[in-house]
Amino acid sequence: MRRRFLFALAATWLAAPTLQAANGQSPFVLGIAPHTSARVILEMYQPLRRYLEAALQRPVEVRTAPDFTEFARRALNDEYDLAVTTGHQARLFQSDAGYLPLLTYRADFKAVALVDRKGPYQDIAALRGSTVLGLSPTSLVTLWGQRWLRLQNLGDVTIRYVSAADSVSRLVLAGDASLAFTSLANYQKLPPEQREQLRILAESEPMAGRVYVLNRRWVARQKSIEQSLWSFAASPAGLAYLTQNQLDGYRRLRPRELEAMDPYAAEVRQVVLGR
């Protein structure tokens, strides 16, 4: 309950000035998958929020969710106007709720398995009987990690889920888990002194990373909204955002890039909808 209150409080605090200036106009909701803490997300997407607000001439709010599963539920319930999430959820939102894929980042998205560089889990066999960490059961890095574990035939590994991506590495270094699954981007953003204590035991092939998908109710303005995103990427604020987060700019989705995520999307559907 307290976490939900903090999410709402943070979103309200950041959006309040724009709502006051909007003369009661309903906000355009930018939904960001919880790839890191709510505080970091709300700060990270302020440049895009401000740019879209000016382009759309209406208030824009940044919202996230406590975990990836709840984020998917909210998106499928049409709570977001523009959602930014990893490719498997983007595919689910497209196929099940009619969201319109717009673009993604140029930088590769990869999942990684992290261990303590000086810990006892320096090879795959050592993981047998241990506890590993994922985010929520529907995050792409966790789904990849669970498939990777099955391929290793370890059998009795326990998977524990945590809600904050920036805490999994600390838990591994504290000895609370043998290994943690996270994204390569989140690993690269760790403080240098923390990153140096970790080692990548396994790394995925590139997958469809964070994808921008537009709610179908905005189909009439799809072209203008997409153009606003491209213009943001070329602006000083956009260039700073893309550089700071090592995203290399935007790109169009490749043919069938999202369709390739169908197996992962099906796993999310099973968890969220029970089918």
Identify what each model region corresponds to:
Residues 2-7:
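N-terminal export leaders
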Residues 23-88:
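Extracytoplasmic small-molecule ligand-binding "clamshell" domains
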Residues 26-35, 41, 107-115, 193-233, ...:
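Periplasmic-binding protein-like
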Residues 47-56, 103-104, 141-162, 188-195:
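Ligand-binding cleft/hinge of the Venus flytrap
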Residues 62-73, 86, 158-170, 206-208:
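Short helix-initiation/N-cap motifs at beta->coil->alpha
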Residues 84-96, 171-198, 202:
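A ligand-binding cleft/hinge motif common to bilobed small-molecule-binding domains
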Residues 97-106, 201:
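A structural signal for short loop-to-beta-strand junctions that line the ligand-binding cleft
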Residues 115-132:
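Flexible hinge/capping segments at coil-to-helix
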